[in-house]
């Protein structure tokens, strides 16, 4: 949960929360009709949130708004279905089945830290009408089984062990995701799911990486909601390619790693977008090159030749402007 929603109270900016304290009835009144929902809800962090008034209001009404008029009208119907339906229509509570914009506005009233509120309205998800509750559940996903925190560190000398991640039910609960990653993402991103099924892929399906390691689903100022711009996302893990180099390869720094690599999956080695590496080079290097006035054809630049036979430092070099070493 964001820092602003972890304290003893959360002040809301929504107009209805300017209602008089007497307009709020408390969770016990909600339970009289919505027993299962309240039992589920009270296991979550959301159930502990409050906002200030004459008395601190806590529970369902923190998100759904004051419930007195709604509750009184339903009770006055005395079990008559038609009267209840009319009461619900006349005195509705906020429903997260509303529009994506209304749902997001409700959540972002509290979730304002880490630039979430600033960027989400301009994110690709928001632009496509994706609301918070399509990925997150406002009530409980699963009860926490393991209170210990995950340990992502490796013991000294062990470089190929799988990281010990937090118990799945713990981080599902903490972020209230309806499904674990990557399943929650694959629900919409079917094409990317197919790419991750290709023989060479980043280890997202195996659980060694998450989509959110590279992307921020709540929005950033970068293409594809990347956490860092361009190649910086990649070198966050591939540190040996970071540089800086005296002789930078413009394809890396200007266009980025995706010029040559498909980060999600490929049928080619090293996630290359082309089967033969030389085909990648020829996308940019279209002219007739010579080295010391000797045509490349005499140096093995033929159908079966690979540029990296000689240009071994293709990501950048501190020694040679032609990336020969």
Name what the model sees in each region:
Residues 1-325:
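Short sequence/structural segments immediately N-terminal
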């Amino acid at each position: 949960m964001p820092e602003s929603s972890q304290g003893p109270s959360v002040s809301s900016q929504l107009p209805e929360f300017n209602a008089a304290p007497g307009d709020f009835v408390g969770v016990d009144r909600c339970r009289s009709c919505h027993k299962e929902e309240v039992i589920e809800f009270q296991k979550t962090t959301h159930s502990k949130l409050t906002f200030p008034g004459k008395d601190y209001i806590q529970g369902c009404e923190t998100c759904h708004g004051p419930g007195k008029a709604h509750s009184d009208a339903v009770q006055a119907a005395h079990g008559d279905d038609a009267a209840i339906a009319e009461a619900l229509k006349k005195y509705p509570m906020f429903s997260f089945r509303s529009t994506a914009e209304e749902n997001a506005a409700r959540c972002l009233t509290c979730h304002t830290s880490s630039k979430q509120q600033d960027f989400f309205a301009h994110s690709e998800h928001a632009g496509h009408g994706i609301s918070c509750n399509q990925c997150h559940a406002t009530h409980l996903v699963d009860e926490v089984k393991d209170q210990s925190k995950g340990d992502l560190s490796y013991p000294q000398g062990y470089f190929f062990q799988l990281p010990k991640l937090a118990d799945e039910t713990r981080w599902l609960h903490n972020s209230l995701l309806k499904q674990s990653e990557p399943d929650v993402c694959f629900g919409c991103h079917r094409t990317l799911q197919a790419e991750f099924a290709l023989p060479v892929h980043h280890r997202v399906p195996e659980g060694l990486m998450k989509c959110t390691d590279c992307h921020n689903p709540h929005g950033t100022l970068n293409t594809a909601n990347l956490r860092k711009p361009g190649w910086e996302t990649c070198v966050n893990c591939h540190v040996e390619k970071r540089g800086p180099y005296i002789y930078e390869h413009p394809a890396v720094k200007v266009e980025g790693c995706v010029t040559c690599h498909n980060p999600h999956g490929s049928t080619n080695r090293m996630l290359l977008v082309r089967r033969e590496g030389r085909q990648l080079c020829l996308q940019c290097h279209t002219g007739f090159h010579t080295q010391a006035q000797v045509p490349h054809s005499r140096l093995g630049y033929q159908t079966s030749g690979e540029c990296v036979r000689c240009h071994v430092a293709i990501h950048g070099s501190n020694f040679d402007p032609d990336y020969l070493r």
